């Protein structure tokens, strides 16, 4: 009787808790509208709204059978399996909760912005899965606009790797390309494998820029370029991104064309060989040592400007070739730089090599005295494009500085210093050998900080504030350089070291910062409302003249709202009473539906320019972007003045095509003429390998 009663209690508790059994030390619980346990077959059967949560996996279905000993499961009817980074759906699934291996029939998978379909999806033990006779797409429709169909597709959601074989790229059900193998990374890939950008440009004529990318793995890829320009002809290129295990990453880029110019008034159109070769490599040897190499070879001075204006020329018009190695230690740094002119049309100061040793501030014994040194040894050779006489010299330079920082009172920091710079030249400008130049330095840095917190909170002129905090930081720096033993006019000028001259100047600075607290992410955080910095140099009797202010610089930043930012910076010359530069920027980004930017650029006797950009989303399908640059005045290199003319005008119309974005752009440039181009972008991977757009420099 006791045995029978104990058995009944055990059975009652078992049924009350649902179908719950041990999987090693981890129980599996089956929940549903109807759950039954069959002791003889050692299985649990669930029906209706079945749910299992087990070790990061959530499985839902209409019906399921789970075997307690083997941990095998068979589920059918609206099967959904959710794992970290992916979701799988199908008609029927067989799965082992212990080995994590299984299969889904008539399956559909989702990982990030990508979808996959197949007759069968095999679940592998490492959380990856294999799709049989299926396809991938970023279009979520049951009949996608495009798809990458393949016999087999391997997907690993953890690192985003995709590997497909026997591939057909289809638009609708129409194949447009066949590939034996296709590797892709859902997390790191910048643009689709095949890209075509058609358009028209005044200098080029009609064009089609084509690229094909093949990924060897997530760290190395090869991009082939084949571009046709009706006026200039065919051009081809290769971009190879690589990774060397233990030796860093790099990029090799080539581009070649036999350019013809149909605009030339010649009976026979000749061809001009033009090319570029670029190599970049970075090796982070450890957390304190690194090496960088760059090599830029071009056929002529305008190669980059003519073919890669937006992508490269505007950012770096004349790149130089060099090798640089740096070892950073807590007490010092040691570097070696080798810069060599590769292109004869460039003006380059070669350094073959330059070795630099920098000893950071080191305390001497237990004294309140610190010592630092900066020493370089350089072989200099200045080469010019006009083949003028080269200027070369061997230079050894060392700067040694002693500093005694202290606090006079609690709020005032003072740091007086003395130093000397000794420079040895293998020869002077007039041919003298072994020239020694010595310069004595001294000075003092003073700084303090005041702050006040206003407890009031509320709104002023629409700006919310909570306990306004005002910080004032005045600084004074004095620098004195005694007349060097050799005048700069007697030395070859390679950089700032050679231009050192007598100086006695104060640099005055006043920084104001306004801060408040705002609710961000569920907690109060400190944000800047405004920032103003004014600095100026006061020169004491320079070159026999009276003392005067010089080089007054102002920097203003206002962020009254998180969606609005205003910046302005200027440089003023009190001697001539002229502003040398003055730049302003206003940027509004209140929502995803519209953004507005407006800026002005002023450089004395060179340019006065206005720039504006507007992005506006009309509805869920249409948007447009307009950008303009207008020169109120520009002085060209030849002295010719341009007044009240547009420099650039550009408009882009954007159409949302569900999984694609179609863009049509028209631009007019004073230098490049009229350009029209069209781009189709995947929403899941919107980057393209070519760039024509003008950009508004958004405030930081």
Region roles according to the model:
Residues 6-18:
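Bacterial N-terminal signal peptides
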Residues 1-3:
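N-terminal secretory signal peptides that target proteins for export/translocation
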Residues 23-125, 210, 214-216, 242, ...:
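Post-signal-peptide, soluble extracytosolic/periplasmic N-terminal scaffold domains
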Residues 36-38, 65-67, 154, 514, ...:
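A generic structural motif
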Residues 92-97, 101, 109-130, 134-137, ...:
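Outer-membrane beta-barrel proteins and related beta-barrel translocases across Gram-negative bacteria
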């Amino acid at each position: 009787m006791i045995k029978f009663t104990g058995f009944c209690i055990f059975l009652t508790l078992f049924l009350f808790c649902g179908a719950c059994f041990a999987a090693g030390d981890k129980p599996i619980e089956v929940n549903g509208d109807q759950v039954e346990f069959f002791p003889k077959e050692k299985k649990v059967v669930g029906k209706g709204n079945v749910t299992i949560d087990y070790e990061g996996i959530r499985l839902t279905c209409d019906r399921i059978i789970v075997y307690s000993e083997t941990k095998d499961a068979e589920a059918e009817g609206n099967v959904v399996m959710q794992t970290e980074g992916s979701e799988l759906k199908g008609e029927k699934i067989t799965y082992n909760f212990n080995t994590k291996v299984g299969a889904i029939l008539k399956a559909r998978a989702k990982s990030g912005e990508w979808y996959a379909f197949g007759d069968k999806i095999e679940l592998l033990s490492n959380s990856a899965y294999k799709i049989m006779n299926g396809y991938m797409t970023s279009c979520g429709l049951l009949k996608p606009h495009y798809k990458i169909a393949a016999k087999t597709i391997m997907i690993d959601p953890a690192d985003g790797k995709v590997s497909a074989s026997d591939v057909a790229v289809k638009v609708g059900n129409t194949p447009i390309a066949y590939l034996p193998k296709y590797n892709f990374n859902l997390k790191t890939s910048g643009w689709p494998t095949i890209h075509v950008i058609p358009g028209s440009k005044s200098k080029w004529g009609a064009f089609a820029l084509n690229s094909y990318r093949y990924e060897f793995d997530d760290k190395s890829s090869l991009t082939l370029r084949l571009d046709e320009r009706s006026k200039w002809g065919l051009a081809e290129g290769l971009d190879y991104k690589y990774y060397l295990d233990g030796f860093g990453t790099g990029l090799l880029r080539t581009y070649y064309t036999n350019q013809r110019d149909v605009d030339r008034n010649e009976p026979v159109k000749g061809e001009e060989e033009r090319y570029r070769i670029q190599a970049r490599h970075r090796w982070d040897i450890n957390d304190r040592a690194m090496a960088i190499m760059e090599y830029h070879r071009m056929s002529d001075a305008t190669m980059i400007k003519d073919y890669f204006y937006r992508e490269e020329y505007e950012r770096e018009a004349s790149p130089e070739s060099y090798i640089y190695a740096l070892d950073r230690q807590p007490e010092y740094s040691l570097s070696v730089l080798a810069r060599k002119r590769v292109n004869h049309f460039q003006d380059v100061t070669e350094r073959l090599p330059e070795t630099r040793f920098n000893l950071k501030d080191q305390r001497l014994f237990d004294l309140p005295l610190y010592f630092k040194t900066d020493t370089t040894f350089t072989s200099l050779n200045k080469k010019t494009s006009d083949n003028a006489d080269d200027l070369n010299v061997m230079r050894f330079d060392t700067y040694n500085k002693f500093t005694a920082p202290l606090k006079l009172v609690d709020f005032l920091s003072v740091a007086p210093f003395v130093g000397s710079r000794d420079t040895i030249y293998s020869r002077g400008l007039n041919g003298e050998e072994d020239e020694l130049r010595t310069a004595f330095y001294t000075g003092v840095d003073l700084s303090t900080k005041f702050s006040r917190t206003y407890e009031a909170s509320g709104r002023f002129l629409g700006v919310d504030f909570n306990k306004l905090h005002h910080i004032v930081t005045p600084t004074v720096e004095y620098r004195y350089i005694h007349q060097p033993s050799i005048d700069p006019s007697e030395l070859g000028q390679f950089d700032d070291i050679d231009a050192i001259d007598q100086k006695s100047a104060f640099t005055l600075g006043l920084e104001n910062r306004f801060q408040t607290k705002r609710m961000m992410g569920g907690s109060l955080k400190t944000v800047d409302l405004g920032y103003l910095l004014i600095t100026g140099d006061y020169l004491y009797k320079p070159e026999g003249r009276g003392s005067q202010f010089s080089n007054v610089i102002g920097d203003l930043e206002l962020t009254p709202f998180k969606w609005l930012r205003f910046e302005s910076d200027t440089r003023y010359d009190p001697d001539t009473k002229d502003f040398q530069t003055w730049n302003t920027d206003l940027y509004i980004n209140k929502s995803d539906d519209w953004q507005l930017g407006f800026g002005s650029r002023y450089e004395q006797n060179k340019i006065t320019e206005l720039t504006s950009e507007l992005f506006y989303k009309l509805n869920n399908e249409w948007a447009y972007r307009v950008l303009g640059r207008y020169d109120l005045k520009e002085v060209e290199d030849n002295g010719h003045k341009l007044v009240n003319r547009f420099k650039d005008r550009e408009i882009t119309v954007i159409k949302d095509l569900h999984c694609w974005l179609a863009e049509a752009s028209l631009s007019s440039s004073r230098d490049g003429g009229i350009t029209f181009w069209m781009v189709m972008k995947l929403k899941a991977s919107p980057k393209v390998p070519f760039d024509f757009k003008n950009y508004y420099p958004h405030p930081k």
